[in-house]
Structure formats: structure tokens, C-alpha cells
UniProtKB/Swiss-Prot annotation:
Component of the ATP synthase complex composed at least of ATP5F1A/subunit alpha, ATP5F1B/subunit beta, ATP5MC1/subunit c (homooctomer), MT-ATP6/subunit a, MT-ATP8/subunit 8, ATP5ME/subunit e, ATP5MF/subunit f, ATP5MG/subunit g, ATP5MK/subunit k, ATP5MJ/subunit j, ATP5F1C/subunit gamma, ATP5F1D/subunit delta, ATP5F1E/subunit epsilon, ATP5PF/subunit F6, ATP5PB/subunit b, ATP5PD/subunit d, ATP5PO/subunit OSCP. It is a single-pass membrane protein. It is found in: Mitochondrion membrane. Subunit 8, of the mitochondrial membrane ATP synthase complex (F(1)F(0) ATP synthase or Complex V) that produces ATP from ADP in the presence of a proton gradient across the membrane which is generated by electron transport complexes of the respiratory chain. ATP synthase complex consist of a soluble F(1) head domain - the catalytic core - and a membrane F(1) domain - the membrane proton channel. These two domains are linked by a central stalk rotating inside the F(1) region and a stationary peripheral stalk. It comes from Opisthocomus hoazin (Hoatzin). This is ATP synthase F(0) complex subunit 8. It holds the Pfam family ATP-synt_8. The gene is MT-ATP8.
Length: 55
């Protein structure tokens, strides 16, 4: 079965990871989000208990 022979597939996998690591990843790390996170105060919501008619 030629699928089990790792000789042609291993260099292809290593080359693709090398391309990802050296070319694509630095470009992705330079990306700055359009909306930076802000420090907002959390508001607590108040819930009213429900009165069940059968209790």
C-alpha cells in the first residue's frame, strides 16, 4: 500500500510546517484587532424568583 510509505509524505509535511512557521505565522502575529479589549465594569443583574403555582 503506497499510502503507508512515509517517504514522499514526510518531507511534504515538514515543508508545509516550515512554510507556516517562517512565513505565515509572523504575518498572523502582526495582525492587530480592530477593537482592542477595554476594561469595563461588570454589572450585576438582579433576578426575581419565580413563584410556581403548584408549590
Amino acid at each position: 500500500m503506497p499510502q503507508l510509505n512515509p517517504t514522499p509524505w514526510f518531507p511534504i509535511m515538514m515543508l508545509s510546517w516550515l512554510i507556516f512557521s517562517l512565513i505565515i505565522q509572523p504575518k498572523l502575529l502582526l495582525f492587530t484587532p480592530t477593537n482592542p479589549p477595554s476594561n469595563k465594569t461588570t454589572t450585576t443583574t438582579r433576578s426575581n424568583p419565580w413563584t410556581w403555582p403548584w408549590t
